[in-house]
């Protein structure tokens, strides 16, 4: 806690050098000018809403990064808050980029149809015969140790969609958690201590971010031929460098600073590690804004005819009017799309006003976000509900088995008590069969009665011969046996 207090005191007392603030401010102005120009250019040629609404979200990532980095550079005490907001928009930009690629294919339905078509073709040949089969996604090392090859199918699209959206959800939740922990002084950014919240959130975020990037890379690898008309490699590399290289750049700066290897005059003038990172990001975003003008231009949309809500993809072979379109041949073709023709709609004006375009970006894009977030949460909750249901069923089954076992045990115990009881009573004393004559044979009974009478008589008269013959070393007195002296 003392280190955290000293850090806040240093951040409050520290101010960036004038030359650093001036240079970062110049790049900020350049970034805002070029990025806003590109955004308004897309809004003025807003003829393909399904693509452009998400493309604008990707373009706005550059000015957002630049503004937050400049604010953190000028006032280091809010660097944690700025970094959290920057990370939140990073996850949103990744979602927009994934949605943009899907829209360029023709939407979710056409993307799923494309994957089903490629997946059906992969069934025709064994998996080991063709290493570069299009319908199979093979994982690189070390992911191949944990995951089996993925076959293109609607399931694959759902995995990619879930992987990208989960990062946006987890990033937002961890950002809110970090703000709460920072308010209580237990966030400790950059410190790996058991009592700090930073290492735990960092582990969760790194895993979520890595999985989202992996899903995006696999989706790009599966659809790059279908996306050839938009030159996806340049767009993908530009986006990936902004999102992920900036993060690894921050890790490298922190590592070099902790090892004492940052001994340049510029690094020493920028005392805090976050200030070095913010200064570099301001310069990088100025360069990225220039690259965006060439990678995400609005000119292709301006050349389109009427505005359309969806896209129809046909092959260049059918551009001739004399050749009728064969839907089956188009569906089964493996070649990428070359000509994209819009639906003619005479009731819709060609283009929209900037106000209408902005409303569609926020409202229309928000509808997609809500739908995808609901889908992701459902996909995450349903397995948990099924697991809980199965667990409850197992507990109920175990309870029933225990009750059944106890019931059988009690029944066996009762049966054993009944079977252990003697079939004949062993009676002694006055109930002795020798005295009462319990034998069923009447002759024997009469003989015993006769002997009993003779015994009584002999005992009273002093004669002992008959008693000795009947009972050996015993004699009877009354109804009891006694030993003979």
Curated annotation (Swiss-Prot):
Give the protein name, as stated in the record.
Protein LAZ1
State the UniProt keywords alphabetically. Cell membrane, Coiled coil, Cytoplasm, Membrane, Transmembrane, Transmembrane helix
| Membrane topology reported for the UniProt record | Multi-pass membrane protein
Q: Where does it reside? A: Endomembrane system; Cell membrane; Cytoplasm, Cytosol
Q: Please list the residue ranges that the record places on the Lumenal side of the membrane.
A: 41-53, 189-196, 263-277
Pfam families recorded for this chain? Solute_trans_a
Major subcellular location class:
membrane
**Per the record, which residues fall in region Disordered?**
400-485
Q: Where is the composition biased (Polar residues)?
A: 455-469
Regions that span the bilayer: 20-40, 54-74, 168-188, 197-217, 242-262, 278-298
Residue ranges, Cytoplasmic compartment?
Answer: 1-19, 75-167, 218-241, 299-485
């Amino acid at each position: 806690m003392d280190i955290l207090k000293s850090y806040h005191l240093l951040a409050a007392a520290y101010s960036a050098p004038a030359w650093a603030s001036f240079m970062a401010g110049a790049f900020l102005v350049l970034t805002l000018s070029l990025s806003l120009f590109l955004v308004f250019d897309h809004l003025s040629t807003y003829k393909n809403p399904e693509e452009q609404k998400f493309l604008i979200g990707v373009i706005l990532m550059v000015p957002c990064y630049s503004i937050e980095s400049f604010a953190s550079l000028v006032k280091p005490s809010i660097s944690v808050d700025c970094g959290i907001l920057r990370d939140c928009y990073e996850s949103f930009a990744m979602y927009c980029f994934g949605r943009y690629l899907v829209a360029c294919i023709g939407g979710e339905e056409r993307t799923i149809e494309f994957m089903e078509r490629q997946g059906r073709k992969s069934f025709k040949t064994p998996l080991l015969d063709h290493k570069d089969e299009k319908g199979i996604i093979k994982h690189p090392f070390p992911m191949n140790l944990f995951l089996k090859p993925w076959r293109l199918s609607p399931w694959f699209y759902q995995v990619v969609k879930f992987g990208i959206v989960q990062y946006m959800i987890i990033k937002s939740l961890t950002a809110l958690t970090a703000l709460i922990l920072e308010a209580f002084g237990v966030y400790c950014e950059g410190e790996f201590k058991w009592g700090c919240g930073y290492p735990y959130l960092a582990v969760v975020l790194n895993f979520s971010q890595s999985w989202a990037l992996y899903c995006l890379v696999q989706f790009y690898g599966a659809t790059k031929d279908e996306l050839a008309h938009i030159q996806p490699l340049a767009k993908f590399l530009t986006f990936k460098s902004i999102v992920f290289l900036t993060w690894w750049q921050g890790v490298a700066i922190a590592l070099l600073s902790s090892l004492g290897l940052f001994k340049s005059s510029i690094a020493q003038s920028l005392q805090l590690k976050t200030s070095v990172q913010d200064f570099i990001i301001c310069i990088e975003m100025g360069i990225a804004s220039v690259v965006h003008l060439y990678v995400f231009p609005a000119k292709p949309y301006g050349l389109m005819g009427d505005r359309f809500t969806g896209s129809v993809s046909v092959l260049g072979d059918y551009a001739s009017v004399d050749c009728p379109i064969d839907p089956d041949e188009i569906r089964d073709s493996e070649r990428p799309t070359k000509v994209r023709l819009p639906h003619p709609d005479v009731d819709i004006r060609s283009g929209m006003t900037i106000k209408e375009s902005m409303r569609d970006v926020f409202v229309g894009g928000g509808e997609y976000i809500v739908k995808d977030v609901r889908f992701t949460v459902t996909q995450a909750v349903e397995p948990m509900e099924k697991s809980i249901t199965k667990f409850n069923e197992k507990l109920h089954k175990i309870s029933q088995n225990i009750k059944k076992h106890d019931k059988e045990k009690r029944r066996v115990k009762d049966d054993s008590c009944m079977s252990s009881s003697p079939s004949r009573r062993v009676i002694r004393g006055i109930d002795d069969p020798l005295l009462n004559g319990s034998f069923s044979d009447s002759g024997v009974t009469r003989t015993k009665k006769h002997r009993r009478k003779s015994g009584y008589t002999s005992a009273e008269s002093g004669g002992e011969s008959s008693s000795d013959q009947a009972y050996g070393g015993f004699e009877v007195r009354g109804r009891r046996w006694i030993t003979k002296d």
